[in-house]
């Protein structure tokens, strides 16, 4: 059990009983990102303790998320072209539950990278992605305010949620950057190929001109 009762019937968390996992030793860059965010095992514990409230309200959270996306027609078009709202709702529910599972490991990170590549592939602009995550953060903060009375635990839970959402966004934005870099490399390669073709064509013309003379 996560909770014990004090004499005044106030629920407090028995933190020692909460099992979480933060392991990313195979990826030094990701490990550095997590260190810079200050995302710790204690944060994962706060997320896991709060998961029952998230699970209880997950339908409303996801509905609000997609209602907000529905305000932008280009996003609706992207969704309808590549999937459906109902399918994506199931995916988002699973995604959110994993965020509050208390586990961040290589598998967690690889899943995020895969999702990021999908976002890039379907043409989801970064401004919409960031805006959508901001709406999630507001929803989570309101949920914390409604369910946690203790000031310190409330602050730590909100901080943990902010960190995990920031980490998720970093993974996606990094994938966008990689795509842009690859596109720039391809453009430079095309420029070189065109330049070489022009030089070769000029050389051939010069050779033909000399033969004619």
Give the positions of each predicted feature:
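Charged, compositionally biased N-terminal leader segments and the immediate start
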Residues: 1-45
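Heme-based O2/NO sensor domains and their adjacent alpha-helical segments
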Residues: 27-38, 47-48, 54-141
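Disorder-to-helix initiation segments
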Residues: 43, 47, 154, 191-194, ...
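Short coil/turn segments at secondary-structure junctions
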Residues: 45-49, 120, 149, 189
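Generic detection of well-ordered alpha-helical segments
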Residues: 59, 63, 134, 138, ...
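Preference for long, well-ordered alpha-helical segments
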Residues: 148-176
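Long cytosolic alpha-helical coiled-coil signaling stalks of chemosensory transducers
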Residues: 170-213
